Swiss-Prot record:
Entry keyword annotation includes Signal: yes
Protein name: Chymomexicain
Alphabetical list of SMART domains matching this protein: Pept_C1 (SM00645)
Pfam families hit by this protein: Peptidase_C1
Length: 215
């Protein structure tokens, strides 16, 4: 795996989006990973619909929170996810309108879990494609992050999904869904060496990525 990578440089990351005021980070994280692998496999970067997951993923709980696995599985089971343009974000859960929407969907075949609490496995995963990761984000330090390599203070009770889109020797590079005015233009650098197997803010505990074949 490469010493460092930033999937933005390879055109595999859409502009930073904003979930607020809805607790739909899970949908944004999943969608960003699907946008990433789709660009890597097809050469096309297409902004996809978080709203479809919010409305239609029955395993998750809308604006009250959801699951990386359930939402990635929804995309695999339902022939893909519609584009952002076709099914735009509304900041609240509505009824599922996926069947009424037209246009092509972006498909995946399934997902894989990165072994928990294993830094190198996660780095290898991110070397191949953007990966959905969880953080503890409720602390003031995380909320007010402005830049640099973040190493807390934070605990390990994961409550927020983001998308790891790169890394360097000292840090992971994560895309958040709190708009471009938060952090470093919407991104956060998380310290890699935390001295704990869970990683800084629990970032190594629960990571998933979608699988998409070449067609």
């Amino acid at each position: 795996y490469p010493e460092s990578i930033d999937w933005r440089d390879k055109g595999a990351v859409t502009p930073v989006k904003n979930q607020n005021p809805c607790g739909s980070c899970w949908a944004f994280s999943t969608v960003a990973t699907v946008e990433g692998i789709n660009k890597i496999r097809t050469g096309k970067l297409i902004s996809l619909s978080e709203q479809e997951l919010l409305d239609c993923d029955r395993r998750s709980h809308g604006c009250k929170g959801g699951y990386q696995t359930g939402s990635i599985q929804y995309v695999a089971d339902n022939g893909g996810v519609h584009t952002e343009k076709e099914y735009p974000y509304e900041k609240k859960q509505g009824k599922c309108r996926a069947k009424e929407k037209k246009g092509t969907k972006v498909q995946i075949t399934g997902y894989k879990r990165v072994p928990a609490n294993d830094e190198i496995s996660l780095i290898q995963g991110i070397g191949n494609q953007p990966v959905s990761v969880l953080h503890e984000s409720k602390g003031r330090a995380f909320q007010l992050y402005k830049g640099g390599i973040f190493n807390g203070p934070c605990g390990y009770k994961n409550d927020h999904a983001v998308t790891a889109i790169g890394y360097g020797k000292a840090q992971l590079l994560d895309k958040n869904s709190w708009g471009p005015n938060w952090g470093e233009k919407g991104y956060i650098k998380i310290k890699r060496a935390s001295g704990k197997s869970e990683g800084t803010c629990g970032v190594y505990k629960s990571s998933y990525f979608p699988i998409k074949g070449y067609r």
